[in-house]
Amino acid sequence: LPDGIHVVYVSPLRALNNDMRRNLYEPVKGILEAAKDLGVELPEIRIAVRTSDTSPYEKQKMLRNPPHILITTPESLALSLNAPKFRDLLRNVRVIVVDEIHDLASSKRGSHLALSIERLENLTGRPLQRIGLSATIAPLEDVALFLAGFHDNGEPRDCCIIDARFDKKVDIRVIAP
C-alpha cells in the first residue's frame, strides 16, 4: 500500500473519532493476523486521528509516517488542507466518509466541510468517492445533494442513495391477571 492518506473519515464529534479509530483498528489487526496465519503477507494499514486535540508530536509523526486512513473533524480537515506539508499527504485520497452527516448538512460547519471536500477533490485531481453516514437522515435526497455537490456548470453531480433503514417488527403483549 503506497504511503499517503487514501481515506478521510470526517465526524463532527472528536469522541466519535476516537471510537472510530478503535473500531477500525481491531478488525484491521484481526485481518492482518488471520492472513499471516494463512501465510499471506498483507501490507500494514495505518490509522490516525487528527483533531484539535492532536499534539504537535503526533502531527509530526503523521508527516514522517502518514496514515492510510485519516480520521478527523471538518475543522481539522480544513486546517490540514492549509498546511503545505500535510496537504501533500492528501493528494492520494480517493474516498471521503462523512459520518453523522445529518448534523453537518444544514449548518455552517457543513458549508465549511463542503468547501473543504471540493478543495480536496481539486487537490487530488480526480473525483472522490463520497460516502455519507447517518442513522437519522431526512430527507435523504437533500443530504445526498449536499454531499455530492455540483459540477462547474451548476448541475448536481450523480449519486447513489442506499437507504439501509428497516422497519423493526415489534411484538408486544400485555398479560394481565
Per-region residue spans from a language model:
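SF2 helicase catalytic motif II
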Residues: 70, 74-78, 84-126
